[in-house]
Amino acid sequence: MKQDIHPKYEEITATCSCGNVMKIRSTLGKDINLDVCSSCHPFYTGKQRNVDTGGRVDRFKKRFGALGKK
């Protein structure tokens, strides 16, 4: 491989919305926030979970709510 052309591969912190914190290796170079992880994802836990989409729904209703009313 050529020297000094590849991005740095370093350890970062990935924090999930459930509070789970993981140390992973990435070329991103900064800490990341996750919506779901293996500790809270329904596939792994076997439980159903509601995802918070209130902001998007409210924005949609605000834009197009008047069109549905006659």
Swiss-Prot record:
Known partners and oligomeric status: Part of the 50S ribosomal subunit.
Chain residues that bind Zn(2+): C16, C18, C37, C40
Keywords in alphabetical order: Metal-binding, Ribonucleoprotein, Ribosomal protein, RNA-binding, rRNA-binding, Zinc
The keyword rRNA-binding appears for this protein: yes
Function: Binds the 23S rRNA.
Cofactor(s) required for function per UniProt: Zn(2+)
MF terms in GO: metal ion binding; rRNA binding; structural constituent of ribosome
Cofactor annotation comment: Binds 1 zinc ion per subunit.
UniProt cross-references to PROSITE patterns, sorted A to Z: RIBOSOMAL_L31 (PS01143)
GO cellular component terms given for this protein: ribonucleoprotein complex; ribosome
Entries under InterPro entries matching the protein: Ribosomal_bL28/bL31-like_sf, Ribosomal_bL31, Ribosomal_bL31_A, Ribosomal_bL31_sf
Protein's name in the database: Large ribosomal subunit protein bL31
Record-stated family: Belongs to the bacterial ribosomal protein bL31 family. Type A subfamily.
Keyword Zinc: yes
Alphabetical list of Gene3D superfamilies matching this protein: Ribosomal protein L31
Pfam families registered for this protein in UniProt: Ribosomal_L31
GO biological process: translation
Organism: Alteromonas mediterranea (strain DSM 17117 / CIP 110805 / LMG 28347 / Deep ecotype)
